Amino acid sequence: MQYAPFASDIELPFYTSLASHKINHDKLDDSARPVLGLYEIRPSDPEAASCRIQIHGNALTSSEAEGMIKNVNTVEEYRNMDRPHLLHQAGQMIWDAIHDGTILSCPSLLCSFVIVSFADLKKYKFHYWFAFPAIHSDPQWVPVQPTDQVSQSHQDHDIDNLKGSHLSPHESTALVEAVQTWSYIVDHRQRGFFLARKSRLRPDASSGDPQTKSAQQDTSNSNWQIASLSEYENGFFKNVADEDCYFCFSDPSNYEQAPGWMLRNLLVLIKQRWGIERVQLIRYRDVHAKRDQGRSTVIRLESSPKQEPQTPKSLQTRESLPLPKVTGWERNSTGKLAGRIVNLTEYMDPKRLADQSVDLNLKLIKWRISPTLDLEKIKHTKCLLLGAGTLGSYVSRNLLGWGVKKITFVDNGTVSFSNPVRQPLFNFQDCLNGGARKAHRASEALTEIYPGVETTGHALSVPMAGHPIVDERVTRADFDRLQTLIDGHDAIFLLMDTRESRWLPTVMGKAAGKIVMNAALGFDSFVVMRHGITEDEKPAELGCYFCNDVVAPANSTKDQTLDQQCTVTRPGVAPIASALLVELFVSLLQHPKGAGAPAPIARNTERDDHPLGAVPHQIRGFLSNFENLSVTGKSYPSCSACSDKVVSAYREQGWDFVRRALNEHGYVEELSGLKEVHEKAEEALADIDWDEASDNEEIEIL
């Protein structure tokens, strides 16, 4: 007796689902999980392509699945897996279910399967090997000849018995209708195996021809009763002639002489549980749309024709029986007993592949190091970068590394020939023909690096304190665009060259309650900081970039020599500062209080409770001695940028406030209270008495 083995047929979405479960849920857990496999009767399939177990994209979501998948963590585990033991376990499960009777409540266990897999998620290669456990019968089942079959050669006899006898169109139609009706009222795991009982009706008395009566009795004057396998033990075949009793299974095999693989386990059930050694089976292969074609066949098998029929064994005896030999590992496409490999990069959209690859390294952080890391919060934070030069280039690349999907550039400069070596978003071609706009080219470069990022560039000049307005219409338009951009983003990065260019975005960010991140460079030093936000319950908030100043920002570009006009700094300072700025930003997002996270009171070498540790206020770095200092600075009540008076004036007056701040010298100092601070300092200085002595005497300050 030959059987058509199952062949695995995996849909591409399943691999994506498996990868998602591994990254987001299973992580390092390689425990076996249920997987749903389906097979169906498909008359149109060629013989070699029939008898397939289909694994759909949602196969991992079903709790009622008889398949198991063990997705291991390394390729070495996959290669060194104890496969004989795994197959033995799968066969033992079927064997035990047959003996304890649970197989009757879930017959689909007879066609259970196991998958061993390894998902190489960096290269998107999936290694897998299916096993369809089949318990051997000893002695084997062989086809038997019906008692009314005419004499013929032994070889022809075997071939015909393997093919079986087809049902007539009337019988087939009646059987399909009965099976369809029964399948509506039973669990889907019952439908693959069932009992069928033929009821023969009395022939029509009006027909006088005995041969006609006999034909009607065999075909049209018969109907079918269908029941689950469990009904065998409730007397479903009681007082029914043997030739009218059938054990049935849905057979996806289109081979005429080779029934499907699941029959092997069904025969073990029939013999081991019920002691039956001669059985009549129906290979149910019809579909409702073609129910009159009669593809279903009846086959008759015998287990031990030379022995007396055995009686069913007692439960205790059955449970003590050893498991027979189990086979079932699938052969690969070359016919060898080996696993298969599928390379998903051949089928995936490159952009989709890039999306998943970008997420992979980040999600791996959650496996061991930081399980509570909120990657979605980082991903959906919209970042506005004011400055697309050295700092802007490095900051944007680091934000991409953290999975930020929306990055907007603002810069009014063009790419010069000195830029590409220090600014990684630009190249030599960008310097030609007067130079490309930095904001636009930076946006294009990010898209070339990672097409999944949503990025735009805006060429505009940020109005600067100390720089009087030349064309109010243009400056007002730039202000309005900047205000729209700030309102549409969650975080603002101040990455410009001059101090005064950071003033207005600081005021606007504070007024809008946005996260404001700032980085500034010296020759061998830098400062990286986050601006504080207003919190009602914490009046002593953190300061901003201008809180240590006692004067308002002024024009710092006036009368500068060449070395002052260019950003003269050690080349490594910008990458270091940019990396620290982005890491500080991400740590801030992960803190339970977000932008309101307090600065650590004292230096603590241990990680805090939240995912990425402490969130300092400022980091000041010095490459002269390679030292970083975490500094905390409180807000200054008379700050020219973040004080309540300045922020309130901006909220109330908007553009009018900005126009006065740019055009009227001393307006910001007077509004913020810095002018009063200067006056009090001068008064205090005037009150100091100086005791003048001779040149040989020390000056004593009273």
UniProtKB/Swiss-Prot annotation:
Q: Which gene encodes it?
A: atg7
Origin species:
Penicillium rubens (strain ATCC 28089 / DSM 1075 / NRRL 1951 / Wisconsin 54-1255)
Q: What is known of its domains?
A: The GxGxxG motif is important for the function, possibly through binding with ATP.
The UniProt transmembrane annotation reads none
| PANTHER family (UniProt xref) | UBIQUITIN-ACTIVATING ENZYME E1, UBIQUITIN-LIKE MODIFIER-ACTIVATING ENZYME ATG7
The active site lies at: C566
Disulfide bridges in this chain: none
Location within or outside the cell: Cytoplasm; Preautophagosomal structure
Q: Where is the composition biased (Basic and acidic residues)?
A: 154-163
Q: What is this protein called?
A: Ubiquitin-like modifier-activating enzyme atg7
Q: Name one GO cellular component term.
A: phagophore assembly site
Binding partners and assembly: Homodimer.
Q: Name the protein family.
A: Belongs to the ATG7 family.
Q: What does this protein do?
A: E1-like activating enzyme involved in the 2 ubiquitin-like systems required for cytoplasm to vacuole transport (Cvt) and autophagy. Activates atg12 for its conjugation with atg5 and atg8 for its conjugation with phosphatidylethanolamine. Both systems are needed for the atg8 association to Cvt vesicles and autophagosomes membranes. Autophagy is essential for maintenance of amino acid levels and protein synthesis under nitrogen starvation.
Keywords per UniProt: Autophagy, Cytoplasm, Protein transport, Transport, Ubl conjugation pathway
